[in-house]
Amino acid sequence: MTEEELHAEASRILKALLARRQLKHADLADALSRVGVNESVSSIKGKLHRGTFSFAWMLACCKALGLSKITLDDDSV
C-alpha cells in the first residue's frame, strides 16, 4: 500500500467508528476533551479529511469512544 492509501484507510476506519455509533465530529471533540485531549471540531474534520494523524491520536480517539479492543479487520471495525 502507498502512504496515501494508508492515510485514506486510517481516515475511513475512524469515520466508520463514528458512523456506527451515530456520532458527529462535535461528539468526538467532547469525548476527547473528557480524556484530556483538546481538539476543535474543525481540527478533527481536517485530520479525518487528510487522514494524517498519529497513531497516538487514533488511540486517544478509541479510548474517548470507549473502545477496549482494536482490530484491523474491516469486518470488525
Where are the model-predicted features located?
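A short, Lys/Arg-rich alpha-helix, primarily the initiator
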Residues: 1-24, 30-31, 70
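Short Gly/charged-rich anion-binding patches and loops
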Residues: 13, 27, 56-60
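Core residues of bacterial helix-turn-helix
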Residues: 21, 32, 36-37, 65
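Recognition helix of helix-turn-helix/homeodomain-like DNA-binding domains
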Residues: 33-52
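DNA major-groove recognition helix of helix-turn-helix/homeodomain DNA-binding modules
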Residues: 53-71
